[in-house]
Design a protein with these regions (language model features):
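Helix-turn-helix-type domain boundary/helix-start signal
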Residues: 31-32, 150, 183, 208, ...
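Alpha-helical scaffolding flanking metal-ion-dependent phosphate/phosphodiester catalytic sites
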Residues: 139, 162-173, 191-202, 206-287
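Short N-terminal micro-motifs specific to bacterial/archaeal maturation
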Residues: 29-30, 130, 184, 191, ...
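Short clusters of hydrophobic/aromatic residues that line enzyme substrate/ligand-binding pockets
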Residues: 18, 33, 179, 185, ...
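Terminal helices and disordered tails flanking the catalytic cores of nucleotide-processing hydrolases
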Residues: 1-92, 96-99, 103, 264-287
Length: 287
């Protein structure tokens, strides 16, 4: 059945799954939408209460479009919507993001195999989108790109992507305010930032994540090769390799994205800085 106005209520758990026109799951039953504009978008899009679209008894393959027919632009905008809903539910009612994150990680892995140039181009160009969400997506895309170039297995890459999508859970509530902030940070803000890797790990454990690689990657993604990072001031090869990849992806994404108090850096300038200006902090073999 097509989703129409009146079927979804604001701040009430969804009574059904919502599927896109291609049959893929967009939102899971039980998710709460807190913004009316999001409901309006769902009603404007071609979305359904069953994976088979209008006909509950029709085979999905007979009516869905192929995933390859979806442009990268459409996919990024759709993914931004899904991530925003997921993280909003997490901040508002403690929604467990793990299932959504792991599914999106696999999607991103395949997108980065099938159309890496378009994906990379989009996350460079769309820095106008909601800061906390596009930065999270940038971290995942750049991490997958790096891991693929290192020849990592699919399982290892998707696990890394999951870490990239959750590394900032511990400061997610602050990210939009920090984006708009100019001038020195207050002491409590600095303390929260320095604690966020450990806070993120605690949150993931609370949501049932037991994978040590995922947790280690998140917990040490702000360590630096020269020992200047946090929280444990680890150095060199003592830093988990996944964390070293996340550190580079995060630094690169942060620097190409605009902030209230500075303009975005060009990709060339950022890479030059990573290779020269900050070469002691980041694993140069990975850079």
């Amino acid at each position: 059945m097509r989703v129409i106005r009146g079927m979804i209520d604001l701040e009430v758990p969804l009574p059904f799954n919502i599927y896109k026109g291609d049959g893929s799951l967009l939102m899971r039953q039980g998710v709460v939408i807190y913004n009316q504009s999001r409901i309006d978008q769902l009603c404007q899009w071609e979305t359904y209460t069953t994976a088979n679209g209008e006909k509950d008894d029709a085979p999905a393959a007979s009516i869905v479009t192929k995933a390859d027919d979806v442009t990268v632009t459409d996919y990024i905008e759709d993914l931004m919507f899904r991530l925003d809903i997921t993280y909003s539910n997490f901040l508002t009612n403690g929604f467990n993001v793990v299932n959504d994150v792991t599914r999106i990680s696999v999607e991103l892995y395949h997108k980065m195999i099938s159309d890496p140039d378009a994906m990379i181009g989009m996350v460079h160009l769309r820095t106008d989108l909601k800061h906390s969400i596009i930065r999270t997506l940038q971290n995942a895309v750049f991490s997958i790109l790096t891991a693929n170039s290192l020849g990592w297995s699919k399982q290892r890459v998707t696990k890394l992507a999951s870490a990239a999508l959750t590394e900032n859970l511990g400061m997610l509530s602050m990210q939009e305010d920090l984006f708009r902030h100019s001038g020195p940070l207050q002491e409590w803000q600095t303390e929260a930032i320095r604690k966020h890797p450990a806070t993120s790990v605690q949150m993931l454990i609370g949501m049932g994540v037991k994978d040590k690689d995922w947790l280690r990657a998140v917990g040490y993604h702000h360590e630096r090769m020269d020992g200047s990072g946090y929280p444990n001031k680890q150095q060199g090869s003592a830093i988990f390799e996944e964390s070293r990849v996340l550190a580079i992806a995060d630094r690169y994404g942060a620097t190409i994205s605009p902030r209230m108090d500075r303009k975005p850096g060009s990709p060339q300038d950022v890479m030059r800085y990573l290779l020269k200006g900050e070469k002691e902090q980041y694993d140069q073999d990975i850079v």
